[in-house]
From Swiss-Prot:
Heterotetramer of erg25, erg26, erg27 and erg28. Erg28 acts as a scaffold to tether erg27 and other 4,4-demethylation-related enzymes, forming a demethylation enzyme complex, in the endoplasmic reticulum. The active site is at residues 180, 203, 207. Keywords: Lipid biosynthesis, Lipid metabolism, NADP, Oxidoreductase, Steroid biosynthesis. In Aspergillus, the biosynthesis pathway of the sterol precursors leading to the prevalent sterol ergosterol differs from yeast. The ringsystem of lanosterol in S.cerevisiae is firstly demethylised in three enzymatic steps leading to the intermediate zymosterol and secondly a methyl group is added to zymosterol by the sterol 24-C-methyltransferase to form fecosterol. In Aspergillus, lanosterol is firstly transmethylated by the sterol 24-C-methyltransferase leading to the intermediate eburicol and secondly demethylated in three steps to form fecosterol. It catalyses: 3-dehydro-4alpha-methylzymosterol + NADPH + H(+) = 4alpha-methylzymosterol + NADP(+). NADP(+) binds at residues 16, 44, 50, 75, 203, 207, 236. Its EC number is 1.1.1.270. It comes from Schizosaccharomyces pombe (strain 972 / ATCC 24843). SUPFAM superfamilies: NAD(P)-binding Rossmann-fold domains. Pathway: Steroid biosynthesis; zymosterol biosynthesis; zymosterol from lanosterol: step 5/6; Steroid metabolism; ergosterol biosynthesis. This is 3-keto-steroid reductase erg27.
Length: 338
């Protein structure tokens, strides 16, 4: 049916991805059993068990609504899995109206506690918005011999969207939403080491590269609409995996304090953070593609969307990043597509 809409959300079994799925279903799915289904949400997860669990929880969350959920298996750190997902999506779905490229990885090695304590006491908003006390695992390489964080956060999605565009699953009206970050800082990205094999901040590097690529692609021209959005600062499963429940509670307390002190970016809840991603689907126009949008809140938690400054990106940086990614894409496409 031509009126049916399809939304693909990567990394949707928990955290922000699950929040985005919840928001979309709340808005689109009918309550009455005799109303037609017009919206399909396609979840991507690494395993069948996680996907089926996410579908079950979403259905339990909306007991009085007609829910249409599908899932695709996808591991962004495995390029063979990415190509398999491309083929699965192209075979099963005629088009995609919304594509949320949300899944990603963060590899935390530890916390510099003295630095964390003193920086938080001196300037809590700065310390908990742009933290400098996390120590990331440097130099991790995937089984594809790519930078693990680079592949998981940038290249896997770059390959996915370009292949889907080639197969005409993405149309001119499709809205592709990239998940950026507040920590996408210029200093973290080395253009001589775009995969961050040698850098100490692979996560920040990957998010800055994502920003650079977005503007490079807009400049060149895309066959679909593409938006750059970040979730503010919310506590997801990545926090819980590395910090544990007690430290996550402490982090949430710190985030609430920052919010009361006036920080707009401490969204805390993935559901609240997902508001900006829903707004993009419903209200963003082509003119909004040039702005980096962010999920934000008032002191008392009222949701809003704010534009976010992006540090200067030079034309030469855009050109170098896009040329590198395009070449890598062609290399992997040749390997994976018979």
């Amino acid at each position: 049916m031509s009126f049916r809409k399809y939304a693909l959300i990567t990394g949707s079994n928990s955290g922000l991805g699950f929040g985005i799925a919840t928001r979309l279903l709340q808005f689109y799915q009918p309550r009455l059993q005799d109303e037609p289904e017009v919206f399909t949400v396609i979840l991507t997860c690494r395993s069948r068990e996680k996907a089926e669990d996410a579908c079950r929880r979403l259905k339990e969350f909306f007991p009085d609504r007609k829910i249409r959920l599908e899932y695709v298996l996808l591991d962004l750190s495995n390029m063979a899995s990415v190509e398999a997902a491309v083929q699965d999506i192209a075979t099963r779905f005629p088009k995609l109206d919304f594509v949320y490229l949300n899944a990603g990885a963060w590899d935390l090695e530890g916390i510099q506690w003295l630095k964390a304590i003193f920086s938080t006491l001196i300037n809590p908003i700065q310390a908990l918005t742009h933290p400098t006390f996390y120590k990331e695992t440097a130099g991790r390489v995937s089984n594809d011999s790519l930078g693990y964080i680079f592949e998981s956060n940038v290249f896997g999605h770059f390959y996915l969207k370009n292949r889907l565009a080639e197969l005409k699953v993405l149309r001119s009206s499709t809205k592709v939403v990239l998940t950026s970050s507040l920590v996408a800082e210029k200093k973290s990205l080395d253009f001589e080491d775009l995969q961050c094999f040698h850098g100490e901040q692979p996560y920040q590097s990957s998010k800055r590269l994502l920003d650079v690529l977005h503007y490079a692609e807009l400049e060149k021209g895309l066959p679909f609409e593409q938006y750059l959005v970040h979730p503010g600062l919310c506590t997801t499963n990545m926090y819980e995996t590395f910090l544990g429940p007690i430290l996550v509670m402490c982090a949430k307390l710190g985030f609430y304090i920052c919010r009361l002190l006036g920080s707009p970016w401490h969204t805390i809840s993935p559901y609240v953070a997902a508001f900006a991603f829903l707004w993009t689907a419903l209200h963003a126009t082509k003119e909004d593609q040039s702005i980096k949008w962010g999920a934000a809140v008032t002191r008392f938690g009222h949701e809003r969307v704010l534009s976010t400054p992006v540090e200067l990106i030079l034309p030469s940086e855009q050109e170098k990043a896009l040329e590198y990614m395009t070449k890598l894409y062609q290399e992997w496409k040749k390997k994976l597509v018979s």
